[in-house]
Amino acid sequence: IESAAAGAAVSVSAVDSSKILNVAVGVGGAGKVAVQGAASTALVNKQTQAVLEATDIDKDDDNAARADVTVKAQSDSKIFNTAVVAAGAGTAAVGAGVAVNRIVQQTGAEVQGGTMNLQELDIRAVAAPKIETIGVGGAVGGNVGVSGSVAVNMIANDVTAHIGSGAVIAVNGSVGVVAQSDEQISNYAGTLSGGGTAAVGVSTSVNQISGTTGAFIGDEGESTVKTSVSAKGNGSGIKTDSTVKDEQIHDTLIDKDTLAMGSQIERTAAVQKGIVVDASSTRDLKSFLVNASGGMYAGVAATVNVNLIEGATDAKISNAILNGGIAGSGSRADVSVRAGDYTNSAGFVGSLGIGVEGAGIGAGSDTNTVSRDVTAQVADSDIKAQALKVAAEGKQGISSFTVGMGAAGVGAGVAGVVTVSKMDNTTKAVLTGATADVTTLDVEANHLARTNAGNISTGGAGVGAGIGLSVGVLPDDSVPGAEVRGSTVNSSGNQSRT
């Protein structure tokens, strides 16, 4: 490809948007026995790729009118699922619902090989998968009422921006390799059971978010050909939205942000010049479950919620030469390698069991685990720059509130709640096996973790016994670290490792 004139543009773009709206309703009634069920499944599985491979742009003429090159992949997915189940009968009523929602997607923007002399290069992969679920269920029987619900919501999201395969790129302005992902799950469910003799209600929810968001220059492995990228930092720069303020991370049990459907972590925009390798990801998961059962002799309500978050955010330069073709130190642009990872997880569980003359049992469990690896790394590379910054940042917040109540007029009121909130994150900034000729060097890793958990367990009886049990387990095994090893650094300014 040869530029026809100044301001020429080359664009490779892949954009995909998917939306599923699912409504399921099941209603059953009978004089004696009614059994009603409803099941819904929504699945999204896709790949969105924008690739510029083995392509030369103004290869033979470094003084040509240079082009602006954009390689962009964007994938948005949304599932909205509503389910209503109701059953009523003179003797026994049973209502049960099952919902499974899953999004699996891979989004990539890449430049592989080729020789290019450009004005600007912007490689950008963006993905935003979202699941929203609302479920309501009830069962009322003259003698027995039983209701149950199971919800499974899963997002597996991989986002990659990459320059590799020995590409040789010289840019008068800036180079951006940007990967960005924003994931959301909002789950709301309520069940009600009633029976003249006994009522039982059971609700279970499992919500999982996983995947890797990565921005890379070069290829890992000793046998690979080095990728070369140079930039002078002229022009308008590269737009990023990769930082998140502390106030965006949960720091309370309940407020409008931890409850509201559609709320998400807000990003802060910035513009950077030079060579920008930037990977950032946010995820907001909230699950709200309420379960109530009442019977003359027994009312049993049990509610279980599990939120699982795992995966990684990586920004890496490997086996690469950066600004190697620029002679004067004053003409070398900055090099920024940044990985930012931000998580909010909220679980709210309520169970109420009422037995007028017998036993009322309310049990609830809420589990939130966050396990994310955040890495910003320069490895086995030669870099010349005004400022070289390698930064990793991880911020995670958990809000968990569990209520269990058991009440009986005559007999026993029993309540038990368990809360488990676990952090197991690594946040690393690493310079290893590198040769850096820079004015300033910063290698920093920052980590913020907040856990807010509350339990209420109440068992009471007018005549008889009241028993309440509450258990909370809140470990944090997160490890941050910044290191420089096996590297040669020539610097005329400041060096820092934090």
Identify the residue ranges that each predicted region occupies.
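Low-complexity, glycine- and small/polar-enriched segments
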Residues: 1-498
